[in-house]
Amino acid sequence: MVASTVPGHAERTASPQLVNALRAAAEPLPAPENTAEFGACFDRFGDATVVMLGEATHGTSEFYRARAAITRHLIEHHGFNVIAVEADWPDAARIDNYVRHQAARPRRGDVFARFPTWMWRNVEVLEFADWLRDYNAPLIERRQVSFHGLDVYSLSESIHAVLAYLDGIDPDGAKRARHRYGCLTPWQDEPAQYGRAVLYDERAVCEDGVVAQLRDMLEHRLDYLRHDGDDWFDALQNARIVRAAERYYRIMYRGSTDSWNLRDRHMFDTLQALMGYRGAGTKAVVWAHNSHIGNAAATAMGWHGEFNIGELVRIAYGSEAALIGFGTDTGTVAAASDWGADMQIKTVQPARSDSYEHAFRRTGHARSLTDWRNGRNRELADLLRAPLLERAIGVVYRPETERSS
């Protein structure tokens, strides 16, 4: 659980006052399978510029269905036109081509092939993509809804994307890029090994080449834009990913805080680039884990020097940002026992008595929405300041040691 490092935290149970306040404020929700009815419960967030939808795990069907239902409603009734998810940019670009440009539906194994495959290669995401393709079909291009990845992990795929783009419009530029990216070639399939190599030999650093390549693409943007703006933007983002990924893997062995902050800063910068590229009036929905879309400054993460995309969005957009977390008590989850291991369906341990999830369970609501923004429920907001644990299940889940792992 992400808050297990709360300074001085001793096991405690949520106060009766907090449980009563939650029970009074909570609005019962229908099942997310009732898409229209469920989505309509989130009308209040339609005026936001950025709506961030979280999840307490990376493998719960209900979270994906709930986000899809909310997003559909925000698209249909409030003009949201960018979907940005905690996924690799090149894979999400394949989905974007499918939903906007009538490309063939990606085959199983063509996209989201990197561990953890189940995080985005699942029925719920496919059903949403099919719906989005149908929604976009009658619209002119500038009014269509786009689908993008925010993450930093696609070093190899992004290098190939930049080279493929330059091969088509600037062969000389492609030669320069191959030379600059050549330093990273030995590490493309196992980029974490690049960080280990740099740790022991600073001469292995590839920073100068990737920075020079990004600068080169920016300097030639007017020439490249004459061919196709969307293709140029895609290539530019891939060059930015190569730059960020090189640094991410280079510093990952120096400490988790620096690498975490770099990753979430890149996610925020990517979101900002998307907002700028789509132009005035752009409204975005972000799908990511609670640990990314929550306000890190209000949690143990912030106390240890970490920030996240949610905190950065809150700073940038203020009241025009809505951060919506998702919690769970019991059930099952798709997860692995170790990084790179096979997916398993695991039983989720009941929420600890000293957790927010346990407090919500005690309200008696199976599903509910609780909104305490803008001082509308000051008593509840004050009660929620009491330090409790918050569940955060990632792609690796070991139920027997959930808090410590």
Spans of features found by a protein language model:
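Structured catalytic-domain cores with a bias toward divalent-metal coordination
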Residues: 2-405
